């Protein structure tokens, strides 16, 4: 059996053929499901458009500065739109979002620095040589797809993914800092005699840049947490959480025009990019005619960076696709890793020949897309199930009939072209069945208020489902294409706002990164570790000894320093993906010898397992002997802060021992009114 599996994995084109067969069966349904959603599909479309377009605009400005205008925002937007349209129509996994990513920007900057240092290439043949790199990259991706290389994607474990994510976050911070510093200086190849480049105006531009950078960073981070605000309606908080970041970019851009009229026109400095119809933006479309001018030696030398880029794209594209198809999303349609790598090769080739930086699967936009479609699918299913349940209740049907009618609706809407009936659905709806059936028992006992109300109680029992379709990806890609034509408006954005956005992307990507969480734990003294347990925390905090966790984290820090250090090597920096490829062997053969296998499974778990916090008893401050036994050390000032308000008043704490009834329809232990007890203590 094992030999058959090995032989099967070695068959050429096996993965591509299987992917095409699987997706062909549901291709029509991919479009029908999107069109059937009506105007509801516009919500996830606009959400992903903003999440996709803003980073691409920022990367375009970074490329423009680091390649001295050879590439700009026009090219990054054009590549994202072109590849997005192709993938949404021909791609295997339509939930995957494509875009120009930071690794691509980094690679193209290395290629530029190499080209301008060679008289045979220079800036004039930079894009032509980059096109040859893309040709080699495409060929390598074709070979990977044909050889079924995507079978090894699961060997890239959490260690590799989180190290890579941390590297990108640090590079974002690095770019933000470099950008803020550059606001105090004069751009290259500019006339120093211009009014806006006098010292006082450069200094003013830098100070304004700091205000806009940190202003955007602070407001963007705050808006992302809007769902947990105590103020505003649910719709308002959801809107701010979903669209707050692009809204803050608009707000701070508008504020940048409120500066005094005596400031020169170039203060604050704004995004510099040629318009799509200007000659600098049109020249790269004909880069294919310059490819013949590249000498054969450099054509073959292009294979080396192509090898790095192909490996990087394989890793980045596959991981993005993997996270867009997490098992928690309960997707019904098959994956297409092998075919998508093949298609990525064709898109890389097209972009290279057009003088565009290639696009690949991006994070976190891809899982964000799936999540937004899960919300849409939930709304569609809920609406129909509530309508059916209300109709059954109005007809005074039994609880059994009410549940059967709702189950029938769910199964009908959950049908897949590949599996018309899924036996697991019955199991997933078991909690809903118990809730509906128990409501009948409660009504018989005369407790009508405890009856099942579909409007209030259905949400708690609906399984996760995703509206798997192609329309939202196509529409958001067309919107990105429209953004190319909106360049006159995009150029109004101050560059300092983009530096703030880089910092925002870095900080926003850290929560959930266990490497970062363990890094912060190293700075928590023994006497304060109980604070970590009071809040929600990853499972390794309780299951792995502190010494093992610290050793594993220190090893990651060392390896991260190695990866980051490679990016600083002038020409050899293009080899920075190599350490990540080596992690496959290190994780499989070396780490198991250094760490307990059980501990290693927790520290490098495939899933993010979180344990709820266990807050201390609110009265525990009155019993210091208990704390001393646990080694908890708190100063008198800290104790006093917990006992008093900011006005210096002693707090009166009321302990409520009643169980929280909330919106749960049937708590395990049902407490009747008056059974609880209230006790008040004065500290």
Swiss-Prot record:
The record's listing under InterPro entries reads: HCO3_transpt-like_TM_dom, HCO3_transpt_euk
Induction cue: Up-regulated by boron supply.
Q: Where is this protein localized, as stated in its record?
A: Membrane
Recorded coiled-coil stretches: none
User: Where are the Cytoplasmic topological domains?
Assistant: 1-38, 102-126, 182-200, 260-294, 357-477, 587-683
Q: Name one GO biological process term.
A: borate transport
Indicate whether Transmembrane appears among the record's keywords. yes
Q: Where are the transmembrane segments?
A: 39-59, 81-101, 127-147, 161-181, 201-221, 239-259, 295-315, 336-356, 478-498, 566-586
A GO-annotated cellular component:
plasma membrane
Which stretches does the entry tag as region Disordered? 617-638, 661-683
Tissue specificity field: Expressed in the distal sides of epidermal cells in the elongation zone of roots.
Q: How does it sit in the membrane?
A: Multi-pass membrane protein
GO MF assignments? borate efflux transmembrane transporter activity; solute:inorganic anion antiporter activity
Q: Does the keyword Transport apply?
A: yes
Disulphide bonds annotated for this chain are: none
Q: Which residues lie on this side of the membrane: Extracellular?
A: 60-80, 148-160, 222-238, 316-335, 499-565
Arranged from A to Z, the UniProt key words for this protein are:
Anion exchange, Ion transport, Membrane, Transmembrane, Transmembrane helix, Transport
Give the protein's function. Efflux-type boron transporter polarly localized in roots. Boron is essential for maintaining the integrity of plants cell walls.
Q: Which family, according to UniProt?
A: Belongs to the anion exchanger (TC 2.A.31.3) family.
The name on file for this protein is Boron transporter 4
